């Protein structure tokens, strides 16, 4: 994880932007074939933009996205995120924040802010349907990637 420092409980202390970029650049320089980078870089990752060859955004209905987040969090942290657990409050705040993604403005990481950021990318952009099957989405990425060569 480039964004968060390793802490317990996790996801509570952000790395300084300079350190995030340093770690990512080091990793990207190591890869000979290419790298798939997952996550939102808007607001801090602009120095990496020249290295992008394709940008992919996965969209899915809010209810599906939130259920997937809940399931992921429960699988990763178990009882720690349930009422009485040491991560319960952080998890509750995270889910409230995530629920605002589709409707929030640029004051937080949101769909609106990410769409605006994407307009400045010099590489092709692809929007995938998160409700589609994995194989279908991988095929669309490969098809778009093939156009780049």
What are these regions (language model features)?
Residues 1-25:
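Conserved substrate/cofactor phosphate-moiety recognition/catalytic segment
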Residues 23-24, 44, 137:
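Short acidic active-site motifs
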Residues 28-30, 49-50:
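A short, aliphatic-rich alpha-helical micro-motif
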Residues 31-35:
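Loop/turn-to-beta-strand initiation segments
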Residues 40-47:
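Switch II of P-loop NTPase G domains
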Residues 51-52, 121:
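Short, structured coil segments at secondary-structure junctions
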Residues 54, 59-110:
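A glycine- and Lys/Arg-enriched "phosphate-lid" helix/loop adjacent to the NTP-binding pocket
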Residues 96-149:
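NTP-dependent small-molecule kinase module
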């Amino acid at each position: 994880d480039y964004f968060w420092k390793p802490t317990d409980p996790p996801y509570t202390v952000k790395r300084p932007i300079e350190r995030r970029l340093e770690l990512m650049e080091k990793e990207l320089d190591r890869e000979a074939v290419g790298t798939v980078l997952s996550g939102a870089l808007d607001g801090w990752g602009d120095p990496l933009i020249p290295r992008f060859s394709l940008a992919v955004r996965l969209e899915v209905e809010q209810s599906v996205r939130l259920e997937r987040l809940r399931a992921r969090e429960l699988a990763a942290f178990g009882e720690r995120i349930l009422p009485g657990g040491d991560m319960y409050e952080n998890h509750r705040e995270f889910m409230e924040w995530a629920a605002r993604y589709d409707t929030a403005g640029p004051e937080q990481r949101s769909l609106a802010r990410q769409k605006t950021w994407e307009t400045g990318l010099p590489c092709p952009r692809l929007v995938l349907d998160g409700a589609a099957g994995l194989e279908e989405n991988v095929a669309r990425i490969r098809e778009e990637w093939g156009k780049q060569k």
